[in-house]
Structure formats: C-alpha cells, structure tokens
Regions:
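Active-site neighborhoods and metal-handling regions in enzymes and metal-associated proteins
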Residues: 1-499
C-alpha cells in the first residue's frame, strides 16, 4: 500500500518536473501535533510518530527521525520501501544535502509551501540556486494521492472565562498594541495557534488533545482580524469578538490580506511563519523579525493561572493514584494489556470534575516497548502485562484549571539487576534536578548537566529532552521554556522534569 502511494506521488512529480518532494509533519501553522487532515507524512509512510520528515525522489524515499523514534520507525517502516535516516548520527545526510543531491542542474524540488517553515524553505532556495534549480511550492501533491482524506477540522470555538485565564483579552490586546508601538511595528501577523487563542481567551478542539482553533490573526494600531472558518463561531463568540473589535474573515483569505500589505513595518517571527506566507509579503514592507511577544508572555503564568494549575494537578493526581492502586492490586489476577490499561487510566482521568480530555495520547508501554519514548500501542504491538518487569505510563489531561503531564515507571513484580540500577539512576537524576539551586541567568545547559551527570558517569544517556514547558489549557509542549542549553528559566515558568 505504501509503495503504491509513493509510486502515485512519483508520477505526479514527473509530470511537474520535480525531482525531490518534501512531506513534513506539519500543518499550516507549524504545530507540533497536527489534525487528521494534515497527517500526510503518516499517510505516505505508515510511520505514526509525532515527528519526522519524508523526502521522496524518483527512485528513493527516506524518513528523517530523531532519537525518540529510532526503534518505532525501524518497526513501522519494514516493507514500506522507505529508508530511515537517524538524525544526528554520523554519516547521515541532512534533509538539504539529500534533496540537493537528488535535484539535477536546472531541476526542481517541491513541497506544499503552507506546511514548510520559511527558514527551511529559504535555506533550500539558496542552496538550489547554486544549481540553477528552483522550488515548486504551489501545489499539495499528497492531496491528489489521498483520495479519502479527512476534512479539515471545524470544531466549535468557546470563550475561556477570566476566572481561569487570569487576564482579560482586552488587556492583552492593549498590551500587545503598546508592545508593537515600542517596536515600531504597524502590523503584527500571528500564525501560531496557541498564541492566537491565548491572546483572545478562546479555545477549541481543532487539534487532538490541543484545545486550539485553526486560525490566523492580524492586528494593527486600530484594527484586528481573525481569519477562521466562520461556521465554528456561535452568536455568543461572535458578539464577544465584536466587543473586542476583532473582525471575522474567512480562513483562507489570510494570504490575500498579507499580499495587500504595502510599505508597512510588520512584526512577525519568521521561523514560525510558513514559506508560502512569507513569500506573500511584498518587498515594500519591512519585517521586524523576532519572537512573538505573545509567546513570551504566555510562558510566564499569572498568579491566577498558577493557583488554578495547582488545583488541576491535585485532580489529576487523584486519578493517577486511583489508577496505580488498581494496577498493583490487580496485576497477575485479571488479564491486562497495554491498550486495556491505557483505557482504564483515560477513563479515570476523564471522569474527573472539570476534565476536558487528554493533553496528549497516553503512552502505555510494557517491557521493551517502554524504550520507545513516544510509543503508541496498536492492535499489532499490544503487549500483555505480566507480574514482573516495568510498565511505563506517560499521560496528562486538560482541565479548565490547566494542563498536566506526568510519567511514572511502575515495577509490576520482580526486576532484573540492570532494571533496578537504571531505575535508581533515573531517580537520582530526578532528585538532583529537583534539588539544584541556581542563580538567575543560568542557562538550561547547567540544569541538563545536573540531571544527566549520574548517568554519564556510568556511560549511559537518554535520547530526549530533560524537560519542556507546559501551557495553560493549551499545548502540553510550550515553547520557549525547557531544560535546554540556551534557555534561561524565568520566575513563574511552568516546566516538567523528565530525565
């Protein structure tokens, strides 16, 4: 099936003179998790991980994945004719190198410009120019192959009350206009979904587990435009947006709006704007390229959000405690497998007061499957739980009071000596990270070292981040917070610890 899809794509590429076609894991907004409509890479490869980039040439296909997905990709790509490229490993070409080698002098690479970030697109553009080659980005070729593609999500929009948001949308818009004025910007373009809904205090359900709304937003000193499917707005939300003096426009009209801008100073974050959007901006405009002000403001939680998040974690902790008690009481007594246990936890969480769903798909992994950082149990991989070894569960919920993310590794019975040692090392890592004191201005590199040192001393490591930011009734992974080498922690940031 995968081979047939790839061959169909290659026929379309030949007709258009394209030698290499890029299929990322992305929507039009650079979201980490995407709705079913945007799962083109999964459709073309069979790989279900949440990150990965496919490149198809006329005689080859390769998927780039990071260390979280090496084990999973190896399993899921078997028999697909798609090769795995382990990002960061010695001898593995970069995406750009692979594409450049596949495109002949005067040839062309292709992709849907709406799902490729502008930074990558411009870099590839410069590299291809050296071969007098071009980019064809006006057409979504996977759409022509995917005959039964799901419709784009259009879930109802709802208003997040100030008792939960802690700050009114009026106040946020006034603050944003003041910020624009200080930066000398006349227009600000927003394409990141979590930034938009945070700014307007609205939520939706257009991305699974992420309460966001498919939309774009533009604001000037005296106007504001929300580009959205109007069918998602009831009268209450329309009146609310009208009171905020936000004009509603159809979702796809954003490109016409951007093309109409002339001689403006436009504030945007180019790394978060798609290639097609950036190419739509007329050269008469000046771009003020910096991190979106909303991104930084959203990361620092206000006092109301902090207090509410404590309540959310207590609620979530009760559900987790009930689950762990049930698991330990019944292991070995009743049949259990990864999927049935996952459903048990999801049910306990969703019956909690104020729960609005999961914050990500639960990772329920027994034994060797727990080595896959973002493992997802399927009917084929579903493994029975036994009264021995480790069971890992990584899960979280969405509540009016906030977003949660918790991982636990549970001993179901006797352990090997190696399992005991590794568990103890991870525990030591957690304790060191939780206890470390650091001066303001210390970067994430310092904290990352504190967490990893006990493992490095024994010659082992883990191939994923040590911690990430968490949104408030938003994305479970929220930038720019994280235990990473350049990140400087701020007071009131919300960050997980997960060595």
């Amino acid at each position: 099936m995968i081979k047939e899809r790839l061959d169909s794509l290659r026929e379309l590429m030949k007709e258009r003179g394209i030698s290499a076609y890029l299929v990322p894991t992305a929507d039009f907004h650079g979201s980490e998790y995407v709705g079913d409509y945007f799962k083109c890479r999964c459709f073309m490869t069979g790989f279900t991980g949440s990150a990965g980039t496919l490149v198809v040439t006329l005689d080859d296909a390769a998927l780039w994945v990071d260390g979280r997905y090496f084990v999973q990709a190896e399993k899921q790509l078997k028999g697909s004719t798609v090769r795995m490229m382990k990002m960061g490993e010695e001898g593995v070409p970069s995406l750009e190198e692979f594409i450049l080698a596949a495109v002949p002098e005067g040839g062309a690479a292709g992709f849907d410009g709406r799902v490729v970030d502008s930074a990558f697109g411009r870099k590839l553009e410069r590299l291809l120019a050296g071969k007098k080659a071009s980019i064809k980005d006006q057409e979504d070729l996977v759409d022509l192959v995917w005959k039964d593609r799901p419709a784009m999500s259009a879930q109802p929009v709802w208003i997040l009350k100030e008792e939960y948001a802690g700050r009114s949308a009026e106040d946020k818009l006034a603050w944003l206009r003041d910020t624009m004025k200080k930066e000398g910007a006349g227009v600000h373009l927003l394409t990141l979904l979590d930034d938009i809904v945070w700014l307007l205090n609205i939520r939706g359900d257009d991305v699974r587990c992420n309460p966001v709304v498919l939309s774009y937003f533009a604001i000037t000193n005296d106007q504001a435009f929300l580009f959205i499917n109007p069918e998602t707005l009831n009268q209450e939300v329309r009146d609310y947006l009208n009171d905020l003096k936000v004009e509603i426009r159809p979702y796809n009209e954003v490109y016409d709006y951007v093309k109409s801008l002339n001689n403006q100073k436009i504030l945007l974050e180019s790394g978060c704007v798609n290639y097609a959007m950036l190419r739509s901006i007329d050269s008469s405009n000046e771009i003020i390229d910096q991190m979106n002000p909303e991104t930084l403001a959203k990361a620092v939680k206000n006092p109301v959000e902090i207090e509410n998040m404590k309540k959310a974690h207590i609620k979530d902790g009760v559900a987790m405690t009930r689950f762990i008690y049930w698991l330990k009481k019944n292991i070995g007594k009743i049949p259990m497998d990864e999927i049935s246990v996952e459903k048990k936890l999801d049910g306990l969480r969703m019956e909690t007061e104020g729960n609005l769903g999961l914050s990500f798909d639960t990772i329920s992994a027994y034994g060797a499957n727990a080595a896959m950082c973002h493992y997802s149990a399927t009917e084929e991989s579903n493994t029975p739980l036994q009264a021995k070894g480790f069971y890992l569960v990584d899960s979280g919920g969405q509540y009016y009071e906030g977003t949660t993310d918790i991982t636990r590794t549970i001993a179901l019975g006797p352990l090997t000596q190696e399992e005991k040692e590794h568990y103890t090392l991870v525990l030591m890592s957690m304790l060191r990270l939780g206890a470390v004191k650091f001066p303001y201005g210390a970067r994430g590199l310092t904290l990352d070292y504190a967490a990893r040192q006990v493992m490095w001393d024994r010659g082992i490591n883990f191939n994923h981040g040590t911690g990430h930011g968490v949104g408030y009734l938003l994305n479970v992974h929220e930038r720019p917070v994280g235990i990473r080498w350049k990140m400087v922690p701020e007071r009131m940031d919300s960050c997980v610890m997960e060595p």
